[in-house]
């Protein structure tokens, strides 16, 4: 390989590195924009998710309350049965 061929190859490699550096800078800018300025689609999705989680939490609390109320009623019913027998 002659000296001129080596220099041409070296210039091609340097050009590719410059292109890669430029692409990485563009990627960094896009990622920073995504981090600091979230898109409306992401925010809307998170709002919908927040509503669904709130609904599930409310239903869960209601279910636990219903179970505890049933247990309390069952215990009162059993204690009432024993009081009637005496």
Swiss-Prot record:
Gene that encodes the chain: dad3
Stated family: Belongs to the DASH complex DAD3 family.
Protein name from the UniProt record: DASH complex subunit dad3
Protein location: Nucleus; Cytoplasm, Cytoskeleton, Spindle; Chromosome, Centromere, Kinetochore; Cytoplasm, Cytoskeleton
GO CC terms: cytoplasm; DASH complex; microtubule; mitotic spindle
Leader peptide range in chain numbering: none
Keywords: Cell cycle, Cell division, Centromere, Chromosome, Chromosome partition, Cytoplasm, Cytoskeleton, Kinetochore, Microtubule, Mitosis, Nucleus
The organism of origin for this protein: Schizosaccharomyces pombe (strain 972 / ATCC 24843) (Fission yeast)
Record carries keyword Nucleus: yes
Entry keyword Cell cycle: yes
Biological role stated in the UniProt entry: Component of the DASH complex that connects microtubules with kinetochores and couples microtubule depolymerisation to chromosome movement; it is involved in retrieving kinetochores to the spindle poles before their re-orientation on the spindle in early mitosis and allows microtubule depolymerization to pull chromosomes apart and resist detachment during anaphase.
Main subcellular location: nucleus
GO biological process: attachment of spindle microtubules to kinetochore; cell division; mitotic sister chromatid biorientation; protein transport along microtubule to mitotic spindle pole body; spindle attachment to meiosis I kinetochore
Subunit structure: Component of the DASH complex consisting of ask1, dad1, dad2, dad3, dad4, dam1, duo1, dad5, spc19 and spc34, with a stoichiometry of one copy of each subunit per complex. Multiple DASH complexes oligomerize to form a ring that encircles spindle microtubules and organizes the rod-like NDC80 complexes of the outer kinetochore. DASH complex oligomerization strengthens microtubule attachments. On cytoplasmic microtubules, DASH complexes appear to form patches instead of rings.
């Amino acid at each position: 390989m002659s000296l001129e061929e080596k220099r041409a190859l070296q210039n091609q490699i340097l050009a590719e590195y410059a292109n890669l550096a430029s692409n990485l800078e563009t990627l960094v800018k896009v990622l920073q924009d995504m981090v600091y300025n979230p898109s409306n689609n992401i925010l809307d999705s998170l709002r919908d998710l927040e509503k669904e989680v709130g609904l599930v939490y409310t239903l869960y609390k209601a279910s636990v309350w219903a179970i505890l109320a049933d247990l309390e009623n069952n215990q009162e019913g059993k204690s009432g049965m024993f009081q009637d027998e005496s």
